[in-house]
């Protein structure tokens, strides 16, 4: 079953107040999804959701996203066992982005690299170049083993 999301109201006040969830999809039919750990607030990932992913997430309580590179719905953690159970689902004032507070099953890892968060690097300026530096290299699972059959 797919939830019929209404178009965003033209009235800004109606959009910003409580009422029907009416996501404002971009030209590609997507909204940005920010995902944090419900337990400690750590930023885990940023992804995109289309109407189907939003519906599946709301209906099942398990996070689903839209993969732009694979052009399909993706149930986060389906292969690795690190499913994301949604504890709280929020939207911003314009309803063009959502924030999922999740608990992560399995290895408690969100990133396909095996790390807890996709944000495991800092960006710094070094000798005039922007460079990345790994700040969390703890691997919670081995991606080569986990994704060997995908």
Curated annotation (Swiss-Prot):
Mg(2+) binds at residues 92, 94, 96. Keywords: Amino-acid biosynthesis, Cytoplasm, Histidine biosynthesis, Hydrolase, Magnesium, Metal-binding, Zinc. Pathway: Amino-acid biosynthesis; L-histidine biosynthesis; L-histidine from 5-phospho-alpha-D-ribose 1-diphosphate: step 3/9. It is found in: Cytoplasm. Binds 1 Mg(2+) ion per subunit. Binds 1 zinc ion per subunit. One of its GO terms (biological process) is L-histidine biosynthetic process. InterPro entries: PRA-CH, PRib_AMP_CycHydrolase_dom, PRib_AMP_CycHydrolase_sf. Zn(2+) binds at residues 93, 111, 118. GO terms for molecular function: magnesium ion binding; phosphoribosyl-AMP cyclohydrolase activity; zinc ion binding. Its main location: cytoplasm. One of its GO terms (cellular component) is cytoplasm. Pfam families: PRA-CH (PF01502). It catalyses: 1-(5-phospho-beta-D-ribosyl)-5'-AMP + H2O = 1-(5-phospho-beta-D-ribosyl)-5-[(5-phospho-beta-D-ribosylamino)methylideneamino]imidazole-4-carboxamide. Its cofactor is Mg(2+); Zn(2+). Its EC number is 3.5.4.19. It is an enzyme of class 3 (hydrolase). Catalyzes the hydrolysis of the adenine ring of phosphoribosyl-AMP. Homodimer. Belongs to the PRA-CH family. This is Phosphoribosyl-AMP cyclohydrolase. It comes from Agrobacterium fabrum (strain C58 / ATCC 33970). The gene is hisI.
């Amino acid at each position: 079953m797919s939830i019929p999301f209404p178009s965003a109201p033209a009235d800004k006040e109606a959009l910003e107040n409580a009422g029907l969830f009416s996501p404002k999809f971009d030209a590609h039919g997507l909204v940005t999804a920010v995902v944090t750990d419900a337990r400690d607030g750590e930023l885990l990932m940023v992804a995109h959701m289309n109407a189907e992913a939003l519906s599946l997430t709301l209906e099942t309580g398990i996070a689903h996203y839209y993969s732009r590179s694979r052009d399909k719905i993706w149930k986060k953690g389906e292969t690795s066992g690190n499913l994301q159970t949604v504890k709280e689902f929020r939207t911003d004032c314009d309803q063009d982005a959502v924030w999922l507070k999740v608990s992560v099953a399995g290895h408690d890892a969100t990133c396909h690299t095996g790390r807890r968060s996709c944000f495991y690097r800092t960006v710094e300026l070094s000798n005039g170049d922007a460079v990345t530096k790994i700040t969390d290299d703890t691997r919670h699972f081995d991606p080569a083993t986990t994704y060997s059959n995908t």
